[in-house]
Amino acid sequence: MYDRHEVSVKVALYSSDGKRTLLMRHWGDAGFGLPGGHIDAGEMPDEALERELREELGITIDATPADFYVRDPYDTTAKNHKIILGYTATIDGDIELPDQACDGSEAGPVWLTRAELRLLTKSRQATGIFC
């Protein structure tokens, strides 16, 4: 049994042409993930997603609510049970992404093609392809 349940929101953001997905690069070797984050006390999931995207990317979107729900697959021994509410959205136009180091030393958003996503799922060492 878990001591606590943590709920967060994540969104799969697609480019308007459907060829790219926006991921957040984590610091150093921590890999990549979907934009989003924890739901604060008193927040509804949609409000949390709106706040997280404003904080992380400076954008507002219309997301399709809760397309998927998952338990954190990386946390099998923790006392906390993490539930992720998933959303999807398409970004009309493009968003301005900050310049980042190609060595993975900087965190932030990156656009990835399907081929890059496939390579990333095969090898967590694939950070050089994103420059």
Question: Model-predicted segments: where are they?
Answer:
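A short gly/proline-enriched turn/hairpin at secondary-structure junctions
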Residues: 33-36
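Short, acidic/hydrophobic/Gly-rich beta-strand patch recurrent on exposed beta strands
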Residues: 23-25
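Unchanged
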Residues: 39-63, 71-126
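A short beta-strand-loop micro-motif that forms or neighbors metal/cofactor-
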Residues: 128-131
